[in-house]
């Protein structure tokens, strides 16, 4: 049982390492202005591309640090969601961005499976059952 859990955690680290590495490379290219100006102009963004690159770097770094991986997962999801919206608004394919978003969440589940427990439906508490007049089951 413990060996399976370790393999899942290693798999999550590998997945997040690959995604974060790709984001660090792409974010660095944006921060240092290595993108051609014509490509940046085609995006039609009001923010300078360096700001987006800095956000991408921040998301990737937070995703890799164990203590901040939950925040990194949330921010990275927002980043890829924004990339999907940008491509949808330009009527461009967004399959790769969607795949990266899915991979980020799979890696998050593999690294910390208990983190998704807050998404489950909980039964009514004892006080809520008393408030609506339901019989208490002990």
Go through each PLM region and give its residues.
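Membrane-interface extramembranous regions
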Residues: 1-138
């Amino acid at each position: 049982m413990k060996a399976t859990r370790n393999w899942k955690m290693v798999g999550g680290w590998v997945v997040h390492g690959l995604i974060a590495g790709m984001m660090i490379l792409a974010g660095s290219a944006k921060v240092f202005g290595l993108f051609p100006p014509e490509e940046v102009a085609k995006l039609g963004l009001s923010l300078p591309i360096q700001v987006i690159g800095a956000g991408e770097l921040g998301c990737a770094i937070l995703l890799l640090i164990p203590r901040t991986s939950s925040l990194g997962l949330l921010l990275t999801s927002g980043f890829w969601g924004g990339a999907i919206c940008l491509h949808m608004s330009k009527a461009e394919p967004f399959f790769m961005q969607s795949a990266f978003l899915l991979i980020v969440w799979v890696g998050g589940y593999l690294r910390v499976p208990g983190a998704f427990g807050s998404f489950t439906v909980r039964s009514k508490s004892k006080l809520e059952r008393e408030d609506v007049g339901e019989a208490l089951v002990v």
